[in-house]
């Protein structure tokens, strides 16, 4: 029978993974805090080249971490993002909210003529001020968030704009970078992104260090 040579210790795998990322990824343009965040995101997507597409506004990390420490809710566009958040890492027992499956969402989608992912954000209105918004799946959700902010909606403390896909993903993130309405943000330019990267970023923000 064949014998396979591989590392069996979970902690050793974890530590070696991060060491490889730090050795191979170009982190030179990031601050120390941003580099820690970037390493987590690379770990989630498996591509060291992805750092070229990471953009963090100057005050993003500090704003997001301060909000989380103050107990801000985390508003997620997708259940996969919400489920990826490690609750034990949250500094203030922060509520993690996803309204995509709320029974009111389908009717709201029909009313506004948009996707359920976008319509679900209308149910965030009372929780939006000072929150940490995490969009890792639907470009329509990010576009709609920008429309809400344009129209005077309360501002979150930080936005993680990381939807993935071939239709609207790159454009929605470019729109956020062009005008975030004064809200600190993080994006992954282009088609790359997704729930795993977004949740990894949240977990890094929730508890600094690797």
UniProtKB/Swiss-Prot annotation:
What residues form the catalytic site here?
43 (proton donor/acceptor)
Primary enzyme class = isomerase
Reactions the enzyme catalyzes? precorrin-8X + 3 H(+) = hydrogenobyrinate
Q: Pfam families attached here?
A: CbiC
Q: Does the keyword Isomerase apply?
A: yes
Q: Name one GO molecular function term.
A: precorrin-8X methylmutase activity
Sequence positions that bind substrate: 17, 40
What keywords are annotated for this sequence in UniProt? Answer: Cobalamin biosynthesis, Isomerase
Give a GO biological-process term. cobalamin biosynthetic process
Give the EC number(s) listed in the UniProt record: 5.4.99.61
The pathway that the record names for this protein is:
Cofactor biosynthesis; adenosylcobalamin biosynthesis; cob(II)yrinate a,c-diamide from precorrin-2 (aerobic route): step 8/10
The UniProt similarity line reads: Belongs to the CobH/CbiC family.
Q: How does it assemble?
A: Homodimer.
Task: State the NCBIfam families in the record.
Answer: PRK08285.1
User: Its biological function?
Assistant: Catalyzes the conversion of precorrin-8X to hydrogenobyrinate.
Can you name this protein? Precorrin-8X methylmutase
Gene that encodes it: cobH
């Amino acid at each position: 029978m064949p014998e396979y040579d591989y590392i069996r210790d979970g902690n050793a795998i974890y530590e070696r993974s991060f060491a490889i990322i730090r050795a191979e990824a170009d982190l030179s343009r990031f601050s120390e805090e941003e580099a820690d965040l970037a390493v987590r995101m690379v770990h989630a997507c498996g591509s060291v080249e992805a750092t070229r597409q990471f953009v963090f506004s100057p005050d993003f990390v500090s704003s997001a971490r301060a909000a989380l420490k103050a107990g801000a809710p985390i508003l997620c566009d997708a259940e996969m993002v919400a489920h990826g958040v490690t609750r034990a890492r949250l500094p203030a027992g922060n509520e993690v909210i996803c309204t995509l499956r709320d029974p009111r969402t389908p009717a709201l989608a029909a009313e506004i003529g948009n996707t359920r992912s976008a319509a679900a954000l209308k149910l965030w209105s009372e929780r939006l001020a000072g929150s940490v918004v995490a969009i890792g799946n639907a470009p329509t959700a990010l576009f709609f968030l920008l429309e809400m902010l344009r129209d005077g909606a309360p501002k979150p403390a930080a936005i993680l704009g990381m939807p993935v896909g071939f239709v609207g993903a790159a454009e929605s993130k470019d729109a956020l970078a062009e005008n975030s309405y004064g809200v600190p943000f993080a994006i992954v330019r282009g088609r790359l992104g997704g729930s795993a990267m977004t949740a990894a970023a949240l977990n890094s923000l929730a508890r600094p260090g690797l």
